[in-house]
Amino acid sequence: MAAVILESIFLKRSQQKKKTSPLNFKKRLFLLTVHKLSYYEYDFERGRRGSKKGSIDVEKITCVETVVPEKNPPPERQIPRRGEESSEMEQISIIERFPYPFQVVYDEGPLYVFSPTEELRKRWIHQLKNVIRYNSDLVQKYHPCFWIDGQYLCCSQTAKNAMGCQILENRNGSLKPGSSHRKTKKPLPPTPEEDQILKKPLPPEPAAAPVSTSELKKVVALYDYMPMNANDLQLRKGDEYFILEESNLPWWRARDKNGQEGYIPSNYVTEAEDSIEMYEWYSKHMTRSQAEQLLKQEGKEGGFIVRDSSKAGKYTVSVFAKSTGDPQGVIRHYVVCSTPQSQYYLAEKHLFSTIPELINYHQHNSAGLISRLKYPVSQQNKNAPSTAGLGYGSWEIDPKDLTFLKELGTGQFGVVKYGKWRGQYDVAIKMIKEGSMSEDEFIEEAKVMMNLSHEKLVQLYGVCTKQRPIFIITEYMANGCLLNYLREMRHRFQTQQLLEMCKDVCEAMEYLESKQFLHRDLAARNCLVNDQGVVKVSDFGLSRYVLDDEYTSSVGSKFPVRWSPPEVLMYSKFSSKSDIWAFGVLMWEIYSLGKMPYERFTNSETAEHIAQGLRLYRPHLASEKVYTIMYSCWHEKADERPTFKILLSNILDVMDEES
């Protein structure tokens, strides 16, 4: 059994996993190890631990935070009378007896625990955050108030697993000043039995020993990276590095071969062992149609590309050959198969332990393929991905480092300009018009948004908040707004390119969905296109900070009625499912090459028709299968709409079928 890190008596609230389950409170002995948080019955008379009542795997915990105490708890949320005594003085309120609640959130919802002292609560929250810091599903937001009577008191959301309503801050368990209405009320002292456990000394923290490189993860740099601030470590493409500190954030602390240490962007490296990302022939995000186009452009016998398959976890080898007698040449796509023993093959008689070994063999032997793999084909000038911020920990940008080069346009919040950061890095600079945004709230949210990093999201680099107007600094996208791009280039698109645009947006939205982050204003006007034609989602979450009533009110002239589902139009109820609806409309915009949805109706007429069940027609460029995908986003019942994960899978299936 793993060593116990902490051991304390707390009051536990029942989790009410079933609607009929009663709400009650019981004293439990809680034990924390590196793997589990467990709670037991406790025999106070004998001072012994009783039977185990439940446990949570540490790896499943997504958040640990304080909870705002409930005001005036009703009788059903108070501790029952002691023994058979009937005096109301003996009916002790839970909040007074255990006045410091905190929550442990995991995949089944929140577990509420009440501590007798604030110091003990702080200690537990600190240790819990320490053991979960490498968990992959840590959330960005949480619910500061209790889940009671089928809803959260803080935001009235009725789904227990609903996305949080407040940005998560690292407060180590302390409530914000003034957040507890009972902050001056002293708790009752613990009983002698509890005091014996509470005063039990914690195990001493072991002295930090130097970590051997043999115990560290080794990575290889995929791109060069020049440090942007004093905390960063330089990367050289192809060099190996050891990871000293890895987290779910986009920056890792690393050590190079010379012993230098610093932070590196995690999307610039890949694991050294058996990784294929470092090879010239591998193109991770290339689609089938893009591979075919590139191979035909090269036109070389035996030209090949290894890419991610549309089937999760699979790879495909795309090969070009002229030797078949077809003057245009032909392309074959071979899925890399694997045996139960994890050996890879393209032809069953030839098994290999790694994909690089497999490719190396077929570079010398066709062995059933249309051609030997002679010539690796790759995208020219593979651009390094954007970093989450301009250096580790840098989110406040000095405006003196910015050079303004040209105006790009005017948006909801003000003028947008193209410029350079420190004369070297391309950036877009949004100059926020005073009075257009709830600035203080946005500045708090910007810290969270900077940690949202995905190749199909327009990266937020930082903000300038020391002067007015404030600036928002983002990744620069050379081809501008998707809506204008569709309208201006309308005669140059093939249907496969349109589907790839939908895939780009869906990948970004699947990522936001996994982070429980809502966009709230998804539309072609809020997507941008880079110089390689890749579409990225922009302005995610910004609509919450608009101060213009014409934009925020569902009856306002600027409200995105044409992208909104019935529950938003009628009740202003935003969720991931309202983003799904908007994505369906965005697909329609793409396939109509930038037409206005419901172009024959006014906003009020559109809202009325949507409520009556009217949906957008099939654009002539959209196949029946594509239209089925977009139509699935417009189900009247939000729960019946698919997730972005399902939508992406459906889009990839159609891409394979229609290419």
UniProtKB/Swiss-Prot annotation:
The SH3 domain, residue ranges: 214-274
Phosphotyrosine modification, residue list: 40, 223, 344, 361, 551, 617
Cofactor notes: Binds 1 zinc ion per subunit.
Region feature (Disordered): 171-210
Effect of residue 408 to P: In XLA; moderate
Modified residues (N-acetylalanine): 2
Binding site for clofedanol: 474-477, 542
Tissues and organs where the protein is expressed, per its UniProt entry: Predominantly expressed in B-lymphocytes.
UniProt-listed Pfam families: BTK, PH, PK_Tyr_Ser-Thr, SH2, SH3_1
Cofactor(s) listed: Zn(2+)
Membrane disposition: Peripheral membrane protein
UniProt binding sites for 1D-myo-inositol 1,3,4,5-tetrakisphosphate: 26, 28, 39, 53
Residues covered by the PH domain: 3-133
Protein name (Swiss-Prot/TrEMBL): Tyrosine-protein kinase BTK
Source organism of the structure: Homo sapiens
